[in-house]
Amino acid sequence: MTKREYNSQPEMLEGAKLIGAGAATIALAGAAIGIGNVFSSLIHSVARNPSLAKQLFGYAILGFALTEAIALFALMMAFLILFVF
């Protein structure tokens, strides 16, 4: 009887890539929560002091952009893990 040998390394590598990409996309959930917090704070702040709405909106957009940049970096890392490595 011959012993069958299986080369499971490509399948293991593909599985590790999928797990790594999934772990990298966890940051997207954190970014979504962060964006929600930014605009929630904007609404509360404008409700307290409507005269500062214009200035607060600028700060909120800056906070949104920085939070979204983190999400885009996480998405970029997930795509790099999936398609490059």
Swiss-Prot record:
Any GO CC annotation of this UniProt entry: proton-transporting two-sector ATPase complex, proton-transporting domain
Give the UniProt record's GO annotations in the biological process aspect.
Answer: proton motive force-driven ATP synthesis
| UniProt KW keywords | ATP-binding, CF(0), Hydrogen ion transport, Ion transport, Lipid-binding, Membrane, Mitochondrion, Nucleotide-binding, Transmembrane, Transmembrane helix, Transport
Q: Which domain of life is it from?
A: Eukaryota
Q: Do you know which InterPro entries this protein is assigned to?
A: ATP_synth_F0_csu, ATP_synth_F0_csu_DDCD_BS, ATP_synth_F0_csu_sf, ATPase_proteolipid_c-like_dom, F/V-ATP_Csub_sf
What is the topology of this protein in the membrane according to its UniProt annotation? Multi-pass membrane protein
Give the matching Gene3D superfamilies. Answer: F1F0 ATP synthase subunit C (1.20.20.10)
GO MF term list: ATP binding; lipid binding; proton transmembrane transporter activity
Subcellular location field: Mitochondrion membrane
Q: Give TM segment ranges.
A: 19-39, 61-81
| SUPFAM superfamilies with a match to the protein in the record | F1F0 ATP synthase subunit C
Q: In chain numbering, where does the site feature Reversibly protonated during proton transport fall? A: 68
Q: Matching CDD domains, A to Z?
A: ATP-synt_Fo_c_ATP5G3
What family does the entry list? Belongs to the ATPase C chain family.
- Quaternary arrangement and interactors, per the entry? F-type ATPases have 2 components, CF(1) - the catalytic core - and CF(0) - the membrane proton channel. CF(1) has five subunits: alpha(3), beta(3), gamma(1), delta(1), epsilon(1). CF(0) has three main subunits: a, b and c.
Function recorded in the entry:
This protein is one of the chains of the nonenzymatic membrane component (F0) of mitochondrial ATPase.
Its UniProt miscellaneous note says: A stretch of 270 kb of the mitochondrial genome is duplicated within the centromere of chromosome 2 resulting in the duplication of the gene. The expression of this duplicated gene (At2g07671) is not demonstrated. It is also probably not RNA edited and therefore differs in all the positions known to be edited.
What protein is this chain from? ATP synthase subunit 9, mitochondrial
Q: What is the lineage of its organism?
A: Eukaryota, Viridiplantae, Streptophyta, Embryophyta, Tracheophyta
